[in-house]
C-alpha cells in the first residue's frame, strides 16, 4: 500500500494557488497595529498567512528571535499555535505581552537579545521561524533623502541595530540564524522579512547579502515573495531631487529558507 503523501500545510487547492502568487499586495495592518507606531512593525496578517503556508499540519511551535511588538507570537496564538519571541527592548516586550494577553496558552515573550535563542529554546523543537531583523543602523541616522527623523530601537550594547559596520552586522545576523537553525526541526522553514538599504551614496542589497550569509550558515534558499506595501504610503517625496534620482522603496522581501533534512548532503554545519 502506498503511504499517504505528506502534506506541507492545511490549505485547500484554491487558497494554495492564490497564496502562491509571488507578489503579495493585500496584506494590511490592523487599526491596533497602526496605533502602535513601531518603526518597523510587520502585521499579524502577514505572519498568519506565512504560518498557513509553511507550517505543516502537525507543526506547533513558531519562533521569532527579533519579535519587536510581538506580531509573530500574537499571530501564532490566534491560530492555536505556540509562539515564542525574544526581543532586547524591554518596552517592546511589555507591549508585546499586553497584545498577547493573560491567556497565552504556552506562548511566551522573553526579554533577551536574539543571540540567546539557545538559552530559551531546545534544539530541534521549533516547527517554523518567522522574523524581521533590525535594518542595520539605518533607523538611528538622519536620512538626507527624505529628511525623516531618527528612529531608534533602543540603546542596549547588544542591539544589532547599533552595529555600524555592514559586514560585522551581517556576520552577527549569521551567528543568530545559526542558533535559530539548531532550534529548528529538519526541513523546517525560516522566513525572514527584509528591505534593501541605502546609507548615503551606497546601496546595500540587504536581501541578497543576507541570503548569502544564510546559505553559508547552512540553510537552503527556497524562494522569495515580494511584499508590496504601496498602499501604506501617501506621502512619497521626490528623493534626491533635483540632483540624483533615488528610488522610493515600497516593498520588502519575504525570504524563504529551509533547514535541510538530516540525510541531506548539504546539512547544516
Annotate the PLM regions.
Residues 1-269:
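Class I S-adenosyl-L-methionine-dependent methyltransferase catalytic core
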Amino acid at each position: 500500500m502506498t503511504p499517504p503523501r505528506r502534506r506541507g500545510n492545511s490549505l485547500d487547492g484554491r487558497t494554495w494557488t492564490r497564496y502562491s502568487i509571488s507578489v503579495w499586495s493585500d496584506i494590511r495592518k490592523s487599526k491596533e497595529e497602526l496605533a502602535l507606531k513601531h518603526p518597523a512593525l510587520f502585521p499579524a496578517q502577514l505572519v498568519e498567512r506565512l504560518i498557513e503556508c509553511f507550517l505543516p499540519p502537525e507543526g506547533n511551535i513558531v519562533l521569532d528571535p527579533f519579535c519587536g511588538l510581538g506580531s509573530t507570537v500574537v499571530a501564532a496564538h490566534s491560530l492555536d499555535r505556540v509562539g515564542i519571541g525574544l526581543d532586547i527592548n524591554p518596552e517592546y516586550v511589555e507591549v508585546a505581552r499586553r497584545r498577547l494577553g493573560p491567556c497565552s496558552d504556552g506562548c511566551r515573550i522573553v526579554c533577551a537579545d536574539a543571540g540567546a535563542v539557545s538559552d530559551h529554546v531546545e534544539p530541534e523543537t521549533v516547527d517554523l521561524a518567522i522574523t524581521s531583523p533590525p535594518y542595520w543602523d539605518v533607523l538611528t541616522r538622519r536620512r538626507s533623502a527624505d529628511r525623516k527623523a531618527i528612529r531608534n530601537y533602543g540603546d542596549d550594547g547588544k542591539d544589532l541595530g547599533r552595529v555600524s559596520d555592514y559586514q560585522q552586522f551581517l556576520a552577527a545576523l549569521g551567528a543568530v540564524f545559526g542558533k535559530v537553525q539548531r532550534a529548528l526541526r529538519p526541513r523546517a522553514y525560516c522566513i525572514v522579512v527584509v528591505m534593501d538599504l541605502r546609507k548615503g551614496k551606497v546601496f546595500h542589497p540587504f536581501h541578497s547579502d543576507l541570503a548569502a550569509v544564510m546559505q553559508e550558515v547552512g540553510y537552503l534558499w527556497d524562494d522569495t515573495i515580494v511584499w508590496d506595501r504601496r498602499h501604506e504610503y501617501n506621502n512619497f517625496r521626490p528623493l534626491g531631487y533635483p540632483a540624483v534620482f533615488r528610488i522610493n522603496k515600497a516593498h520588502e522581501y519575504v525570504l524563504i529558507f529551509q533547514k535541510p533534512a538530516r540525510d541531506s548532503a548539504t546539512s547544516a554545519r
